[in-house]
Swiss-Prot record:
<feature type="compositionally biased region" description="Basic and acidic residues">
    <location>
        <begin position="31"/>
        <end position="65"/>
    </location>
</feature>
<dbReference type="InterPro" id="IPR053030">
    <property type="entry name" value="Ribosomal_biogenesis_FAF1-like"/>
</dbReference>
<dbReference type="GO" id="GO:0000462">
    <property type="term" value="P:maturation of SSU-rRNA from tricistronic rRNA transcript (SSU-rRNA, 5.8S rRNA, LSU-rRNA)"/>
</dbReference>
<comment type="subunit">
    <text>Interacts with KRR1.</text>
</comment>
<dbReference type="GO" id="GO:0005634">
    <property type="term" value="C:nucleus"/>
</dbReference>
<feature type="compositionally biased region" description="Acidic residues">
    <location>
        <begin position="72"/>
        <end position="85"/>
    </location>
</feature>
<keyword id="KW-0539">Nucleus</keyword>
<feature type="region of interest" description="Disordered">
    <location>
        <begin position="22"/>
        <end position="120"/>
    </location>
</feature>
<comment type="function">
    <text>Required for pre-rRNA processing and 40S ribosomal subunit assembly. Seems to act in the processing of 35S rRNA at the A(0), A(1), and A(2) cleavage sites.</text>
</comment>
<protein>
    <recommendedName>
        <fullName>Protein FAF1</fullName>
    </recommendedName>
</protein>
<feature type="region of interest" description="Disordered">
    <location>
        <begin position="323"/>
        <end position="346"/>
    </location>
</feature>
<keyword id="KW-0690">Ribosome biogenesis</keyword>
<dbReference type="GO" id="GO:0005737">
    <property type="term" value="C:cytoplasm"/>
</dbReference>
<dbReference type="GO" id="GO:0005730">
    <property type="term" value="C:nucleolus"/>
</dbReference>
């Protein structure tokens, strides 16, 4: 290999390194780097020239002119050089082409972006305008969510207190002096579409009962259940008469519903069904929501029969007897808290 070839190879190597530092290697882009092959071709040429020289020397050796140990060393060195050159040759590998660039699918700009581009404003102004519109939309969404939450709370409150208003309205609210009739008229507000529930417009007995319900609900949340469930002091014979009369009213209500084909909701065992007189007369304040004697019977534990000292544990697979049961029956070892060890005195 001449000096010109060495200079050419060095220049190509420097150019290749500069290109790779700026753009990356050609192999990573899916192309073949031919500058590397030039070096290998030159090396192979040199090695072929060395082989020819060695063959000439070999012919001389056959003639019987020169025979020494140095020739054998040179041959072994040439063989190792040939093996190294064969190993240094690049192996053929499949090309991997990666498309990391933008897609060729055309996405047309929206009408909003077209308008902004036609206006002749800069990109910063356009981005600021877009950010301001997005912030406004987020604020509108937050206000809408807050309004929806407020409406949900008002609806739940109205559903809890609607039975009070309906009970008072059915029970003699046709008179002009009734507070409930005035409440319903004010809640209607002259609209034929429906009643708009507003808390400030509830007046009369309905307002006092609704406020009492809310206070009781808050006290239940805070854990004052016993104070709420505490009954008013009433003589025993009067309370019994009130309970009997209330039970008769409930039976009459259920009978009328059965005759009319109305399916009523189920009530827990021992509790009173809530009807109009329950809310109208506020009877639960005096007699409670259920009969106390039946509640006590329900709360009592069931008798499980005689307590017999049994052995083992019965399962579906049979009787399982533990070592502790065997030791307890045989009496060989003391079983207990201290495992047969005597408690030492201090």
């Amino acid at each position: 290999m001449t000096l010109d070839d060495d200079d050419y190879i060095k220049q190509m190597e420097l150019q290749r390194k500069a290109f790779e530092s700026q753009f990356g290697s050609l192999e990573s882009m899916g192309f073949e780097d031919k500058t590397k092959n030039i070096r290998t071709e030159v090396d192979t040429r040199d090695s072929s020239g060395d082989e020819i020289d060695n063959s000439d020397h070999g012919s001389d050796f056959k003639d019987g002119t020169i025979e020494s140990s140095n020739s054998s060393d040179e041959d072994s060195g040439n063989e190792t050089a040939e093996e190294n050159n064969q190993d240094s040759k690049p192996k053929t590998q499949p090309k991997v082409i990666r498309f990391n660039g933008p897609s060729d699918v055309y996405v047309p700009p929206s009408k909003k972006t077209q308008k902004l581009l036609r206006s002749g404003k800069t990109l910063t102004q356009i981005n600021k305008k877009l950010e301001s519109t997005e912030a406004k939309e987020e604020k509108e969404d937050e206000t809408l969510e807050a309004e929806n939450l407020q409406n949900d709370l008002e609806l739940q409150q109205f559903l809890r207190e609607s039975h009070l208003l309906s009970a008072f309205n059915n029970g003699g609210s046709g008179s002009t002096n009734s507070g409930v009739s005035l409440t319903l008229q004010s809640m209607g507000g002259g609209n034929d579409d429906g009643i708009v529930y507003q808390d400030d417009q509830v007046i009369g007995k309905a307002r006092s009962r609704t406020l009492e319900m809310r206070l009781n609900r808050l006290s239940r949340v805070n854990g004052h259940q016993d104070k709420i469930n505490k009954l008013e002091k009433v003589p025993m014979h009067i309370r019994r008469g009130m309970i009997d009369k209330h039970v008769k009213r409930i039976k009459k209500y259920e009978q009328e519903a059965a005759e009319g084909g109305i399916v009523l909701s189920k009530v827990k065992k021992g509790q009173f069904r809530k009807i109009e007189s329950t809310y109208k007369k506020d009877i639960e304040r005096r007699i409670g929501g259920s009969i106390k004697a039946r509640d006590k019977e329900k709360a009592t534990k069931r008798e499980r029969g005689l307590k017999i000292s049994s052995v083992g544990r019965s399962t579906r697979n049979g009787l399982i007897v533990s070592k502790r049961d065997i030791a307890r029956i045989s009496g060989g070892e003391r079983s207990g808290k201290f495992n047969g060890k005597k408690k030492s005195r201090r």
